[in-house]
Regions:
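Short, glycine/charged-rich "phosphate-handling" switch motifs in NTP-dependent
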Residues: 99
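Charged docking surfaces used in two-component/phosphorelay signaling
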Residues: 15-23
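Active-site beta3 strand of CheY-like receiver
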Residues: 44-50
Length: 145
């Protein structure tokens, strides 16, 4: 069973993620802030982390940095959940090891298929390809502006 860690300070977002991912037979672990998210990532070893960027205290960027620094968590794929859709924010997420980003508000029904697709590609050894595709996507968007 796929295990997803949702780190978000907003309880309604965590609930939305939980309900939709559990409906697709995924196990969901929740953390309401950065420090508890880091602890749960180390203990639970999730298959993927859905990480909010804008949280009080330890924000999502710093959580991602710490996940990358820890040998136990550096290989866990991160999908950033963010209301910040600017190019530099997306690029920062990719530079911090993120493999995708979902802009809030989002359609919760799209979460489980996204997680499945990303994990399938990672299992096939395409993690670097995922990041490269997102970088290319950002470049295209920047060039069209």
């Amino acid at each position: 069973m796929t295990k997803v860690l949702v780190i978000d300070d907003e309880a309604p977002i965590r609930l939305l993620c939980r309900v939709n991912l559990e409906a697709e037979q995924m196990m969901v672990v929740e953390a309401p802030d950065g420090p508890s998210g880091l602890e749960k990532a180390r203990i639970e070893t999730p298959d993927v982390i859905l990480l909010d960027v804008m949280m009080p205290g330890l924000d999502g960027w710093r959580v991602a940095e710490q996940l990358l620094e820890d040998e136990r968590t550096r290989s866990i794929p991160i999908v950033f959940l963010t209301a910040r859709a600017e190019f530099r924010d997306r690029a920062k997420g990719l530079n911090l090891g993120g493999i995708d980003y979902v802009t809030k508000p989002f359609n919760p029904l799209e979460l489980a298929p996204l997680v499945r697709k990303l994990l399938e590609r990672i299992e096939r050894g395409e993690r670097d390809d995922l990041r490269a595709e997102k970088i290319d996507e950002l470049r295209s968007l920047m060039e069209s502006e």
